[in-house]
Amino acid sequence: EDEAVLAHAARGSTSAPWIQWPNRAEFDAHFASIQAAIEGGELYQVNATAPVLGRLDGEAFDWFHRLRWGQPGGYAAYIDDGQDQILSMSPELFFHWDGERLLTRPMKGTAPRSADAQEDAAWREGLHTSPKDRAENVMIVDLLRNDLSRLALPHSVRVPALFDVKGWPTVWQMTSDVTAQTRPGQDLADVFTALFPCGSVTGAPKLQAMRHIRAHEPQPRGVYCGAVGVVRPGGAATFNVAIRTATVRDGHWRCGFGSGITAGSTADGEWAEWRQKQVFLDRTREPFDILETLLLRDGQARHGALHLARMERAARHLGYPWQLQRVADAL
């Protein structure tokens, strides 16, 4: 699989300069309207979004592989329906359901990455302990608990993981796990009826936030903030939340970005988060390898475990696909 990614990435595909709505003044006005609604008791949180537009010089399939090479992992998907090409690089799990156990993993809370190890660790710790981001995260956890309760056996809704922070090539993200055992007789349509759209891309209360979004965002979001996934033989289903997802049509692309706005948010902070999330579109880097030098003595690598650990740190920092057993077998 990695070799296929390399082959497509090497072909190359570039995107022309972007057009963004809103500009900063429009964003500030939109932010103020949301905060006014929160202060008026209408809402607790709104996930506000807007599109970035551009022209694609090259093939959508090649661009997808370049994006995927720049940020491996997550829940990526490529769909071509004959008119539109959907390039989803989502890091967020909407749900996984095996017919009995239902897992959701809402993602709320973002911080930038840094090439400096100490600064990078500080950003991670700052996100993990941020009162604003924790409040935003727990609001959506409570919303998902309520949504899951519509499907769940009594007393089966659980939060086994709260405020986990995971590193991606361009950002740190905070997630929590919400699980439930579903009642007998539920099917996939019931799961979507109860959960869709994911609360992490609407806000809370969910219906009121969706009404606010419809009234204030200039156009429908399309596939962005929807769900893309797979249903396996036997019925097990995994779907992402279609964030970091671009739609290409006739050589032009559109990609939405946004953030959750609460009473504790600031316009400067949310604007910076929007800008930081757009960095993933620049992660269309050329393929590269990690070079490690080591000493062989009598056919054995000296300090092999230390070398493997160093290679793994480099791979994870650079977003390079890492399979420990394959590397160890090669040594």
Report residues per predicted region.
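Extracellular glycan-recognition regions
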Residues: 314-327
